[in-house]
Regions:
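Structural core of flavin- and non-heme-iron oxidoreductases
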Residues: 1-209
């Protein structure tokens, strides 16, 4: 529910290890494009909410806003406590500089006061599209490769297991996008032969070099 981004140096590290063009600067416009920020009210600001408008979007599908807040001495006390332990105040943790403490926004539709999630933002508004098919209760087993050469490896499909246990392959017309989270994305790659051979070898009969 908390809406926070990584440090800019963490994202820039992806380019440094070989993913050309993957930087904080190049990714920021897509962060902004995805957002629909509800600007904090004067009451929320008085209670400690703060943000940098230059790093937010207000026309995207995902609602982001601040929880209901009432002015009190809570943030003053909290700030004093953190300052005494060497933790500085930062205006906004979503600028690429996370070090410090801050009253950060949440993935929330403030107008309806409900939690915002991927279904509300990206699925429900588009579920009637003819070119969108969602497979429920389906597990992705591994990627199917067009070539097994590490330098030219291109995924052309995904092997899946459906709810009834049937194993089949979904073929891609253009590209395969892995979006399984910070834990499952690397796990799926390892099951597909991509990663440290020490871990990949026991998991996959195909190892890409």
């Amino acid at each position: 529910m908390a809406y926070t981004r990584a440090e800019d140096v963490q994202i820039d590290a992806w380019e440094q290890i070989g993913n050309e063009g993957w930087t904080w600067k190049s990714l920021l416009p897509y962060y902004e494009k995805s957002q629909n920020l509800t600007v904090p009210t004067t009451v929320q600001v008085a209670a400690g909410a703060s943000y940098d408008s230059s790093v937010y979007g207000e026309e995207g599908p995902q609602h982001v806003g601040f929880l209901k807040m009432e002015p009190s001495n809570f943030t003053t006390t909290l700030n004093r406590t953190f300052q005494n332990t060497g933790v500085p105040w930062t205006e906004d943790v979503n600028t690429g500089k996370m070090r410090g403490w801050n009253i950060f926004p949440s993935t929330i539709n403030y107008a309806e006061y409900v939690r915002e999630d991927a279904a509300r933002a990206y699925y429900w508004p588009y579920q009637s599209r003819k070119n969108l098919h969602v497979l429920m209760n389906t597990n992705a087993n591994r990627l199917i490769w067009k070539s097994q050469s590490g330098d030219e490896a291109t995924a052309e499909g995904v092997e899946i297991t459906s709810a009834n246990g049937t194993v089949s392959t979904v073929h891609a017309k253009n590209e395969v996008i892995i979006s399984a989270g910070a834990l499952k994305s690397p796990a799926l790659l390892e099951l597909s032969g991509v990663g440290n051979p020490r871990y990949v070898h026991p998991l996959s009969s195909i190892i890409l070099h």
